[in-house]
């Protein structure tokens, strides 16, 4: 007689084995109707799962994160079923759940079109309305191979052949469609009411470019139409804010096939980049970092000593000279240890904070490249802190405080914190790990922030904290990190003389705030839709004359503002003032200063913002004060200008 313990601690007893659905129905008809799956002793199962022993059970519905994932997985199967009904001969491969949706890869004789996508989605809606039961069955590996061979599903056969022979396999069927899957799935297709196909793209079998090309159809699915509508709205907003489109429109940068994954910065984009770099340089100087510069091309022997050659060789750009192998550095850390190693250090020299705007290159797969967000050539705001074990907490706390200040200046206030702790395979003693993990935890608690613990997710050489930004669309971008490293300093011979005159190996803290400049600038472009805070704007002020009579005044005003350190464009073209205002507004220049005869008479300017707000006429000195206050404020108030 199974006794079911529910999440609220209550118990329900049954005289005989029951399914998850039976339990939901016993609780209430509404819950039975809403049930998508169950969680039995922490494991997700179908609603048809039979419970024979005492069990802890949670009923999973569309309100649960697990429930939404199950809806997405089931919708992927629904899409595959629709594709095979509409396009006989289409072979299915894999169809996983991804963030906010799902995809399925197909092999078909021709590319799917937008018209095909509309037909597929319509057929999915029809199949969902049929409320087809979804059932689970078990087969042996040999039975499954025989079945899918008979069905002509070559790719499924290949997948099954890679599974150990003694393992029984689970399959899910709805109507005439059957697919290999661990599950669980919704009990019937009628549970799938809110989905949308979003795009079709190319893909390669097993993600290998040397294999045959497939077609990948992406979709999104949600528990209800309200959530779907909200997500599609966010997608539209993200499309409007796409940094690649805005970058092209504003003339910030471009990329081309002759240099895949590398950025061609244009003058305005480089101005933005330089402003970010100079700001970071000043912040690091203020917080006690010493800036260095290390080589970009380094011998294979150093990468072998550091351990990177064995682990990351395939991701490095390599070359050969005079019978020696070299690699363009994919990261800066081994080079920073070389700087530390020049001259014996004392405990009095620690902590030593070495920072570099390090130019790195990684041979990312071409299919993974995405504008500024995923590149092959990038610059990191990289720094390494060499310190004693007892200084870890203090250094981490100081870093977090600096990171908060920097993110606030860029306009980000919502930060997510994740602490990753020791994995099974690791270097260093448990005592050292205990001490380091406690130091990171105490540093987070000292800041009074909420943080998430990720047990076992640390690197083999030390625990870490990751810092992620949440943008205006609710998207999360992992940017900052601080990582304790017990391994590399020892591997590369770093030592210092301790206060007892013994030689010891320092702890090294890897840290970054922005991550890569390229990616962070991409995030800024999308966050502000190109309308950057005044301190970052490539052009901060456009000075516009109405007629040629104001030319000299405008030129002198522009020179005055330029000499005060502002980025100014004096637009003296023989164009109508309305045309010039519109053009600079579209270019998202924060302040438009208009000069006519009246302004000259009063040594004044008429000021407008890019949002169309008329700030009226004011003296040049007052405008400079307004401009200075706005620049000083940075991104700490997101009041748009």
Curated annotation (Swiss-Prot):
It is an enzyme of class 6 (ligase). SMART domains: tRNA_SAD. Its main location: cytoplasm. It is found in: Cytoplasm. PROSITE patterns: AA_TRNA_LIGASE_II, TGS. Keywords: Aminoacyl-tRNA synthetase, ATP-binding, Cytoplasm, Ligase, Metal-binding, Nucleotide-binding, Protein biosynthesis, RNA-binding, tRNA-binding, Zinc. One of its GO terms (molecular function) is metal ion binding. SUPFAM superfamilies: Class II aaRS ABD-related, Class II aaRS and biotin synthetases, TGS-like, ThrRS/AlaRS common domain. Zn(2+) binds at residues 333, 384, 510. Its EC number is 6.1.1.3. This is Threonine--tRNA ligase. It comes from Marinobacter nauticus (strain ATCC 700491 / DSM 11845 / VT8).
